[in-house]
């Protein structure tokens, strides 16, 4: 009877987890299409507030990308980037190592300007002598070429854009690309050839049309902003949050980002500079999140370099950590992150050995089941002892009738005498569920599993089984486990009905789960069946059935 109740407990915990997830996704109001126009500049500033005029979010989403001949194209081994000479904004990014679709050839596009979405990265210089302004407009840069390409054997590629102000001051905006990397160094070089001191500060912001995440109950995902400060290592700031309240946080270092499933864009200013983190939403439905950096005084006859890093690519934890110690937290494993991180590292270790993510999942399943085996054995031993006590428990029930207090006392004395822990069957279940949930988030959040094949028809472990074969096999394995566990004749009829339907309910739920997660549960069931046979054989020799 205890084994049946444990299966019911698994089901209840599982369904509760799914319902909690859906509640988390739905409790906030839906994104609004527009909000009252507000300046991108927070009320408080790092320095010289009146001169800080970061260009506002556009009042309306532009219709389409300008003609390609007007843009500067940069191609590396990882990225295809398009830069608008007006302001030097990054208006397009294609990730060449990541396909849009598993069987297609088109690369995944992150930044773009289309009729459906407006998503760009903007940076500039503001302040008294800045060349970008919400009033005066943006600087129009010149470039020696309209196309740059990282050559074979070349490790870095510099793309310089130049602008000369009406005062004769030369501003050079240099984009530095590195082989194998998704981060781009944006370096402003200012040569003050005038006879007056200049004051400028750099800003960087990400503009994104408000768009609802393609989330579901089985695969919840987040699309929106996030930021980090010295006090808060990682915090999401959704489109709704931006519409409700503008960010205005002063911090040393920090970063800002726009997140979506598997991919991220982020501005990372210098860690030792004092920056302002800000956000806003325009009347046209554009969400902004960005930073405004330190104010620089540039004496006549001197040069000054002001830089920041921009990342546009997959949520690669190693690459993100190298850019900023907390940027890898955009791979959000939820409240069980402390358990998910070692699971992820172990999964990566197994994959590095076998070269197949599906086999790595099988190995991590065997590892988890092996670690829990002593508890599993204790669980089945406890359940067998409980079954053997059923006749004595029935006698107690007949003796004490409806006197629950005396019945409870007598049962506890019996358990103590027979050295039986009535809760002994629950511990492995309670330990297994957090591991299952943590692995669920690892498989859901880790970009390494996107389009990762297993074998045969499973060509992508991050999405559902296209033919539903594994969920059905998983349901069959649950049915076999159920039949192997003796059902007590005194079991409540309602529990019996629920038990009979549990494999069907789980099968239906798992139809839309990522194939990698279903593989974990299926292999876990097969291991559990094998362990049950071994444990039951040993118990029978001891006279326990």
UniProtKB/Swiss-Prot annotation:
Entry's Gene Ontology molecular function annotations: membrane insertase activity
InterPro entries: Membr_insert_YidC, Membr_insert_YidC_N, YidC/ALB3/OXA1/COX18, YidC/Oxa/ALB_C, YidC_ALB_C, YidC_periplasmic_sf
Location(s) in or outside the cell: Cell inner membrane
Signal sequence coordinates: none
Tree of life domain: Bacteria
Residue span of region Disordered: 44-65
Membrane topology: Multi-pass membrane protein
Protein's GO biological process: protein insertion into membrane; protein transport
Keyword presence, tRNA-binding: no
Pfam families on file: 60KD_IMP, YidC_periplas
Keywords per UniProt: Cell inner membrane, Cell membrane, Chaperone, Membrane, Protein transport, Transmembrane, Transmembrane helix, Transport
GO cellular component: plasma membrane
Transmembrane segments: 6-26, 346-366, 424-444, 461-481, 504-524
Main localization (coarse): membrane
Protein family (similarity comment): Belongs to the OXA1/ALB3/YidC family. Type 1 subfamily.
Reported function: Required for the insertion and/or proper folding and/or complex formation of integral membrane proteins into the membrane. Involved in integration of membrane proteins that insert both dependently and independently of the Sec translocase complex, as well as at least some lipoproteins. Aids folding of multispanning membrane proteins.
Quaternary state and interactors: Interacts with the Sec translocase complex via SecD. Specifically interacts with transmembrane segments of nascent integral membrane proteins during membrane integration.
Family annotation (HAMAP family): YidC_type1 (MF_01810)
Protein's recorded name: Membrane protein insertase YidC
